[in-house]
UniProtKB/Swiss-Prot annotation:
Keyword hit for Secreted: no
CDD domains xrefs: SerRS_core
InterPro entries xref list: aa-tRNA-synt_IIb, aa-tRNA-synth_II, aa-tRNA-synth_II/BPL/LPL, Ser-tRNA-ligase_type_1, Ser-tRNA-synth_1_N, SerRS_1_N_sf, SerRS_core, tRNA-bd_arm
Record's protein name: Serine--tRNA ligase
Documented EC number(s): 6.1.1.11
Species assigned in the record: Rhodopirellula baltica (strain DSM 10527 / NCIMB 13988 / SH1)
Amino acid sequence: MLDRKFILQNAQLVAENSAKRGVSVDVDAICRLEAERMDALKQAEELNRQANEVSKQIKSAKDNDERQELIAKGRSLREQKDAAGAAQDRLEAEILELQTILPNMTHPDVPEGGEHDANEIGRGKTPVPEMDFQPLDHLQLGEKHDLFDFEGGARVAGSGFYFLRNAAVRLDLALQQFAISHLAGKGFTPVSTPDLALTSVLQGTGFNPRGPETQIYSIENTELNLVATAEIPLGGMLSGQILASEELPLRYCGLSHCFRTEAGAAGRASKGLYRVHQFTKVEMFAFTLPDQSTAMHEEMRELECEIFDALEVPYRVIDTATGDLGGPAYRKYDLEAWMPGRGESGDWGEVTSTSNCTDYQARRLNVRSKSNTQKGTDFVHTLNGTAIATGRAMIAILENHQRADGTINVPEILRPWVGCDVLKCE
């Protein structure tokens, strides 16, 4: 969340930023409630001072009548102090509720608008393939090669769940192995994360586990939720900690299952593996000093490009517009892969995103840094980025590497794990 002092000193700027990002929140109400809270705090402190003074007077009371009168006065003052304290707590809760709705501030170079206003800022090394045959989509290819079982998945867990079969299992594992190996070679520590996280951790990382638009599966009568991304447990892993500035940045790559309700998602472009309720992902996450986060964001974007260049998948790099930024993101880049079977005649589909969240998550999670020469502490910056979401990466590989006879070339980088060069129809 944003620093409250910053909000109060820059109320108009914060309100304008929220409007650009499509978030409706009454910033003036935050300022008004904070003024009331400060008044209640001052009142409580003054009443406490008076009550302490009365306590001293009781000890030197001349007689019992005076003592009883002072005791009654002290009791009244403490009751008033408690009421002022309760008012302060109530106002604090109201402010915090509004404060957590506010999105992060926005990088000045981020384009303003919605999905169609995003800027394309680059392309991958692999060109969009020119196919002299009618390409199949990944579901048709999956049927030919016996790769997916959506009907069986629906019988087990409902629509949006599936079984991977045969070569799809090897391909899924190969993508995980490749991404983790690549990132480990770049200084990232591999981590296998819990699939559950406390509600406080979700809220700290900017995810809303409640409400009609939530993407989170919550476990009834508990404070636990299935994680939508490894960003959640990786961010919470160091919550409440003070990190040594000299050891930053800390780089992690987290392997997790991801669970999402995908409420409201439907349509031809979302079919098959593109939008499901459970998938596997390797996620990059970093804790940095404030002056390191911009460089780390560019590093994560470059790593995503390296991974998809190695997979020989055509993609474009998108600088996401204000209306599509998640609440914690100061700036976000997406990689969109070309998918020949998407839509009516092929289209781009998001396969990765990487966000610089500055101190927005760290402030709520209370992750700070301190150097050997520093008296106080500072909030760190946090960043996250998709290395591989295996389902969508599989779509891009199958559809771009298919051949006219229905066989599928396996990207060279994955062959040691997949165990073959070409997937052939059985």
